């Protein structure tokens, strides 16, 4: 079974706390890929921290809040890629 996750992230200062990294790295045991959708700008350090557990990081403007982020994350996966996934898990940092 192939599982993927879309993790929605927002921090007004773009800081990635340790618990975020721990969450992502621990879920990699269960998820084949994790796309992080950031609704806030990230610097290189924050991006690198997210990539410790994520397979991809996508930054976007904070429009549409969480739902807009999930929508854009699903669009980034694309229908062909989604068709190869058995389960898609949408989750966030709270």
Segments the model singles out, each with a brief description of its role:
Residues 1-18:
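N-proximal low-complexity "stem/linker" segments adjacent to membrane-targeting elements
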Residues 7-10, 59-60, 93:
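Short glycine-centered, acidic/aromatic-flanked micro-motifs in structured strand/loop junctions
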Residues 42-85:
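Active-site-proximal specificity loops/subdomain of glycosyltransferases
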């Amino acid at each position: 079974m192939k599982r993927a996750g879309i993790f929605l992230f927002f921090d007004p200062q773009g800081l990635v706390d340790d618990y975020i990294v721990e969450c992502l790295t621990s879920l990699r045991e269960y998820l084949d890929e994790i796309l992080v959708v950031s609704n806030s700008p990230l610097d290189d350090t924050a991006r690198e921290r997210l990539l410790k557990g994520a397979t991809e990081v996508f930054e976007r403007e904070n429009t549409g809040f969480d739902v807009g982020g999930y929508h854009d994350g699903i669009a980034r996966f694309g229908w062909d890629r989604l068709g190869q996934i058995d389960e898609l898990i949408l989750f966030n940092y709270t």
